[in-house]
Amino acid sequence: MASFLEKKKTAAQIVANARGEEKVSAQELLAGVFDDFLELHGDRLSADDAAIIGGVAHFEGKPVTVILTNKGKSAQERLRTHFGCPEPAGYRKSLRLIKQAEKFKRPVVTFINTAGAYPGQSAEENGQGEAIARNLLEISSVKVPVIAVIYGEGGSGGALAFACGDSVWMFENSMYSVLSPEGFAAILWKDSSRADEAAEVMQLTPEKLLQQKVIDGIIPESRSHKRLFRAVKKVLQQELEKYQKLSASALVEKRQQRFQRF
């Protein structure tokens, strides 16, 4: 099957594809890339956020911790996950699993597809800002490799909380930005209908972000899930092999230097 990018797409088209119904799901990625996945639930404080799937799996025969944002497929599931927008319990669950991975010296792989953190009243009352900030602080110094893959929307701090790893990759039909094009257009021009124009200005596409060294590479997409999973596996194998060679102190120093560039 041909790549989705046979013809160069506009930023607006890439945004539409990142949000599209054909986008591979969290569950499909788990089944296609990893073996023996064991899901772990709860943040050990308050709740288990369905917008975050996390647990332990095998990748190429070795244990890894996997964390994915989950938009859901059915209408009922999407309501339960707030369309993939995590609550504080989701960020705290992910951090619990990352600290567990550090304890057992397992690398961490995150897959991100979220418009951003859930903005509801309950999230604010339960410390949404603190939960995101805690993830950023703790992951910056965790002593195991953290590989992040944005496979759809990468929205604001809600996405950054999972993408502050050693290596960040994007699917070719994905986006990564501080806010949505609609939000950008509404703030800058007081006209959300100019979202397509905003998408071009924001430089939120994988190609632009790679040029600016915000990300480390682009994963080609295909309508064939088997081909897509092979591409993901190739990248993960390459990146894990690279970062597992480093000592814990070198790993943390390199990660912190990466983000100090910005």
What are these regions (language model features)?
Residues 1-186, 190, 200-262:
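Terminal-region recognition feature
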